[in-house]
Regions:
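Conserved amphipathic alpha-helical segments that form helical-bundle/coiled-coil interaction surfaces
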Residues: 105-184, 195-199, 213-224
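C-terminal effector-binding regulatory domain of bacterial HTH transcription factors
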Residues: 1-2, 211-234
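A short secondary-structure junction motif
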Residues: 22, 26, 81, 166, ...
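A broad structural signal for alpha-helix termini and local helix breaks/kinks
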Residues: 44, 163-164, 233
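Short linear motifs at protein or domain termini
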Residues: 1-108
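Short acidic-aromatic low-complexity motifs
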Residues: 206-209
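Solvent-exposed, non-membrane alpha-helical residues enriched in polar/charged side chains
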Residues: 20, 24-25, 160, 203, ...
Length: 234
């Protein structure tokens, strides 16, 4: 096994993590005004430049609202957040997501993947179909959950690319972190056979230009992870 290089977090990263944890834990409530940058720097023993850069990044994620000549306030991240916010929530929960967020991700994935199939099947080339089969074959040989999760994501992302819609691959890719986390969880709970069969069956349906069958495979597969025999949240 090859081990990766370890690196210590920067002061800014530590500052961001601590403040986000205070917000996500509820110790800092929505609407609460933060101390001044100078007070934060003094109490946390960091420079004002670290505080300033950290607050800007946290605000960009939707956790804070910085009002000129007024101060910095805790924002409702459910209303103002974005994908980076979701990654912070995952880190706070030890790499997992609340059940409501898992359900939401699965629902979004179903909508995006079905749209990708609908757009891709009428225009997909033989070479693109070959790429999908190659990705499916790699999954058949993979027995490590992290790598297998990457392959499943790659397969679905290829579908988005082959759809011809210029925005669909970008939107789908923005959900990579939570999606691969859920795939890893799926493989740890249920093994690899179900996802291998699903991926190969989609390839066969696409090769036959059979959108109805491909859609049925995707929808049934995701519905099973929501409320069926391969459910991946409580």
């Amino acid at each position: 096994m090859e081990f990766s290089k370890l690196s210590a977090p920067t002061l800014k990263e530590l500052f961001i993590e601590q403040l986000e944890n205070l917000i996500l834990s509820g110790k800092l409530s929505i609407g609460e005004k933060l101390p001044s940058e100078r007070e934060l720097a003094d109490s946390m023993q960091v420079s004002r430049s670290v505080v300033n850069a950290g607050l800007a990044e946290i605000a960009d994620k939707g956790f804070l609202e910085i009002l000129p000549r007024s101060g910095t306030y805790v924002a409702d991240y459910r209303k103002k957040g974005k994908l980076d916010t979701l990654v912070s929530i995952m880190k706070f929960n030890g790499g997992t997501l609340p059940d409501a967020d898992i359900l939401s991700i699965l629902q979004i994935r179903k909508v995006l993947t079905v749209l990708a199939l609908e757009l891709a099947i009428p225009r997909i080339t033989d070479d693109e179909i070959k790429q999908l089969f190659n990705c499916s074959a790699k999954l058949d040989e993979e027995n490590e959950s992290v790598n297998a999760a990457e392959l499943v994501f790659e397969f679905d992302h290829l579908l988005c690319i082959f759809s011809g819609n210029t925005l669909l691959p970008l939107i789908f890719y923005s959900f990579k972190a939570p999606n691969t986390t859920l795939f890893e969880r799926f493989f740890r709970l249920y093994g690899y056979d179900a996802m291998r069969k699903r991926t190969e069956a989609i390839c066969i349906a696409i090769r036959s230009r059979d959108f109805a069958s491909a859609k049925n495979i995707i929808v049934n597969s995701i519905d099973e992870t929501i409320s069926g025999s391969t459910k991946i949240y409580r």
